[in-house]
Amino acid sequence: MKKLLAIVLAAILCLGLMAGCGQTTIIVNMGDDAEATPEATPEATPEATEPAAENTAAPVVDDTPLPEGQLKTGLALVSVVSSSSKAATADADGNAQADTTFVAVLVDGDGVIQDCLIDCVQTKIAFNAAGEIVTAANTAFDSKIVLDDAYDMRKASPIGAEWDEQANFLADYVVGKTIDEVKGIALDDGGKPTDADITTGCTMNIAEIVTGIENAVANAKVLGANVGDTLKLNCNAIVSDSSKSASADGNGTAQADVTVGAYTLDASGVITSCYLDCVQAKIAITAAGEVASEVGTAYDSKLVLDDAYDMRKASPIGAEWDEQAWFFAEYVTGKTPADVAGIALDESTHPTDADITTGCTMAVGAFIAVIK
């Protein structure tokens, strides 16, 4: 009996030690599934040095054997409260800003990156000195790749290069490298590269991009992409209608929803793999017009949250958000983007086709918007 008691106590002690080793994954949560129409372009913050999001992620590696001629498809998001966030004054609105970096990769069976796409979107939500949200719900934000020269970093760049040019240079640089080689990229205290092989084409802060590349490779899955397929990456970023003004009863929430889609197309324009995710960046604001969320606060994406997103109990089919997203991604594989654009939806962008609603009943308007 004493021996049995000792064994039980030892087991409890081990469980306690294990519980202290939890990890937090830093990946961005994508939008609330609403379709958006791009409006005003956000103001650029050239070569800004953001506090790097610590890469504490521990993605589940897909050990599925890679069929001959295929590649793994990976996607990762890194979303943080920007240091450009600022309080409101009597003379000017405040800015609740989240920066979401997202990366897509194709990886071969040896873990070597065969293709890489990098992008970032700055979601800037204005609020006044009373903590009232000023930016309208569903206001859309273009990514830096889409903005191109309108992002306006070139004049501040020591090499005269725009953000998208530097991001594309870095993406090309990591092709042919493994995740360990990417982790080995030397950065200074401001997150900027120091290797001359990189600084000839990229001198901006890349700390969060490197984290995104690492996580995208680690997250890569066998989804059907083949050697020779074309990798695509798009986002749909909007002000969520869940945003609310502050009041005497509590802080308000400036919420941006960013939905991201990475997919591959074969030579005929047919989708061969699809990876979807979404992050909800919720920045707290006070009734005094101040930003209550700390700079650098990171947000997990819905895929990372898994059951913690807690949609299952509200789902008519008892399915969590990530389960429905994967079902929809599998459904569109084998179709063209034009086919996807023609999917029947109700007025709230919920699918109506029984072939979809058996596994996905949530709004998919944002998914369709990023597959184009």
Q: Which functions belong to the PLM regions below?
A:
Residues 22, 46-49, 165:
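Intrinsically disordered, low-complexity regions enriched in polar/acidic and amide residues
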Residues 31-64:
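Ser/Thr-rich, Proline-interspersed low-complexity disordered segments
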Residues 1-2, 54, 143, 301:
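Generic cytosolic/nucleocytoplasmic N-terminal low-complexity/intrinsically disordered segments
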Residues 63-372:
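Active-site- and interface-proximal helix/loop "cap" or "latch" segments in soluble metabolic
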Residues 18-37:
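Bacterial lipoprotein signal-peptidase II cleavage site
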Residues 2-24:
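Sec-dependent N-terminal signal peptides of Gram-positive bacterial secreted proteins and lipoproteins
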Residues 7-8, 43, 47, 51, ...:
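Intrinsically disordered, low-complexity segments enriched in polar/charged small residues
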